[in-house]
Amino acid sequence: MYRIGNGIDFHKLEINLNRPLILGGIECESEFALVGHSDADIILHAISDAILGALALGDIGQYFPDTDPSLKNIDSKIILVKCLELMKEKNFDLVNIDCTVIGERPKIAPLKDRITKSLSNLLNLPLDCISVKATTTEKMGALGRQEGIGTFCSILLEKRS
């Protein structure tokens, strides 16, 4: 049996030299940072939500509510690990992921290899089962005005026999 999951996450982007910009589990050199209750890693959030969605287990807000002060600035890798544990408990394995980052900045092309390698390590997936790509909104809307960035992620899970 196979299951497909989709995850979407958006965060506000601001100039902040005191907070790192984290995408796909890596720190990116940038004057920008994402605003959020956690470290605001939109890629790991979208993957985590896609896993939960494929398993019909809700969303990351149910497991890691932004109203819980103890979760302030939580590393999104912790969120992902919890979702992977839930996936294993349900006897599913991750087959592949396809992520698209949407926004004007930062440019993803120079970061793509590092992000893909990070995801390969975090997810225990071969590099050829991970797609990370980017697009813009052609300067339209909030993302086009560089007020934020987002990620869409689709995943495929396979039930272990």
Swiss-Prot record:
- Quick one: which residues bind 4-CDP-2-C-methyl-D-erythritol 2-phosphate? 9-11, 37-38, 59-61, 64-68, 135-138, 145
Which cofactors does this gene product need? a divalent metal cation
- Which positions make up the signal peptide? none
Q: Where is this site: Transition state stabilizer?
A: 37, 136
Please state the Enzyme Commission number of this protein.
4.6.1.12
Molecular function via GO: 2-C-methyl-D-erythritol 2,4-cyclodiphosphate synthase activity; metal ion binding
Write the record's keywords in alphabetical order, separated by commas: Isoprene biosynthesis, Lyase, Metal-binding
What domain of life?
Bacteria
What InterPro entries does the annotation carry?
MECDP_synthase, MECDP_synthase_CS, MECDP_synthase_sf
GO terms for biological process?
isopentenyl diphosphate biosynthetic process, methylerythritol 4-phosphate pathway; terpenoid biosynthetic process
Q: Which SUPFAM superfamilies match?
A: IpsF-like
Q: Give the Pfam families listed for this entry.
A: YgbB (PF02542)
Q: Which reaction does it catalyse?
A: 4-CDP-2-C-methyl-D-erythritol 2-phosphate = 2-C-methyl-D-erythritol 2,4-cyclic diphosphate + CMP
The record lists a divalent metal cation as bound by 9, 11, 45
The answer to whether keyword Coiled coil applies is no
Pathway per the UniProt entry = Isoprenoid biosynthesis; isopentenyl diphosphate biosynthesis via DXP pathway; isopentenyl diphosphate from 1-deoxy-D-xylulose 5-phosphate: step 4/6
Q: How is the cofactor bound?
A: Binds 1 divalent metal cation per subunit.
Q: EC class of this enzyme?
A: lyase
**What does the UniProt record say this protein does?**
Involved in the biosynthesis of isopentenyl diphosphate (IPP) and dimethylallyl diphosphate (DMAPP), two major building blocks of isoprenoid compounds. Catalyzes the conversion of 4-diphosphocytidyl-2-C-methyl-D-erythritol 2-phosphate (CDP-ME2P) to 2-C-methyl-D-erythritol 2,4-cyclodiphosphate (ME-CPP) with a corresponding release of cytidine 5-monophosphate (CMP).
Q: Which PANTHER family match?
A: 2-C-METHYL-D-ERYTHRITOL 2,4-CYCLODIPHOSPHATE SYNTHASE, CHLOROPLASTIC
Assigned protein family: Belongs to the IspF family.
The record describes its quaternary structure and partners as: Homotrimer.
Q: What is this protein called?
A: 2-C-methyl-D-erythritol 2,4-cyclodiphosphate synthase
Q: What is the lineage of its organism?
A: Bacteria, Pseudomonadati, Spirochaetota, Spirochaetia, Leptospirales
